[in-house]
Amino acid sequence: MKTYSAKPSEIEKKWWVIDAKNIVLGRLASRVANMLRGKHKPSFTPHLDCGDNIIIINAEHVNLTGKKANPKDGKIYYRYTGFPGGIKDTTAGKILSGKHPERVIKMAVKRMITRNALGAKQMSNLYVYANGDHPHMAQQPTVYDFASQNPKNKK
């Protein structure tokens, strides 16, 4: 029996919608990263974008375990401006309570995806919204009940 390798014309992408309300961030991000890569499908091919399109709603209500949500000494995200002494930091709690809470989920998933051109293409199939509304009803997304798969997924 030969090893199956999918062709780009054979790939079928589904649309999924996941409600992130009270879901643990790391567990959600790892599952979404696998779905974006297509590793949940038997037709997974490493060099092709065979993953699905994922819509995440209620990103502002995602949960962080332990002390990571603490605004003072929680999980710290660093960025560099490119100038000497230009390292900036912010915490996950500040981002979640700020203007763009969906960035916490996007950063968590992005850091679990391969860092190359294919990973960037797969990340373009992720749509994260802070509240419960999304403009993708025309694609008829299937609801993915992540919370009921494992009691540890919900906090």
Swiss-Prot record:
GO terms for molecular function: mRNA binding; structural constituent of ribosome. The gene is rplM. Belongs to the universal ribosomal protein uL13 family. InterPro entries: Ribosomal_uL13 (IPR005822), Ribosomal_uL13_bac-type (IPR005823), Ribosomal_uL13_CS (IPR023563), Ribosomal_uL13_sf (IPR036899). The keyword Ribonucleoprotein applies. This protein is one of the early assembly proteins of the 50S ribosomal subunit, although it is not seen to bind rRNA by itself. It is important during the early stages of 50S assembly. SUPFAM superfamilies: Ribosomal protein L13. This is Large ribosomal subunit protein uL13. GO terms for cellular component: cytosolic large ribosomal subunit. Keywords: Ribonucleoprotein, Ribosomal protein. Part of the 50S ribosomal subunit. CDD domains: Ribosomal_L13. One of its GO terms (biological process) is translation. It comes from the Bacteria.
